[in-house]
Amino acid sequence: MPKLKTRSSAKKRFDVKKSGKVKHGKAFAKHLFTFSKTPKSKRSNRGTGHLRDMDAKKVIKEMFPYGG
């Protein structure tokens, strides 16, 4: 049986940690300063976040056949 391939789009967007958490970049931050946003929303878009447990299970199961 051939090897299962990891989705290359998921490789670029997610990082699976040893604890099983899935780290991701925040959305809506690419054109951060091109239009008016509140300082609070700019601060909250910095850095990375983690997916919720149910979403993380789906991502790992569907996108990473060998668990990331």
Curated annotation (Swiss-Prot):
Residues 1-11, 19-29 have a biased composition (Basic residues). It holds the Pfam family Ribosomal_L35p. It comes from the Bacteria. GO terms for cellular component: ribonucleoprotein complex; ribosome. SUPFAM superfamilies: L35p-like. The keyword Secreted does not apply. Residues 1-54 are annotated as: Disordered. GO terms for molecular function: structural constituent of ribosome. Keywords: Ribonucleoprotein, Ribosomal protein. GO terms for biological process: translation. Belongs to the bacterial ribosomal protein bL35 family. This is Large ribosomal subunit protein bL35. It comes from Myxococcus xanthus (strain DK1622). The gene is rpmI.
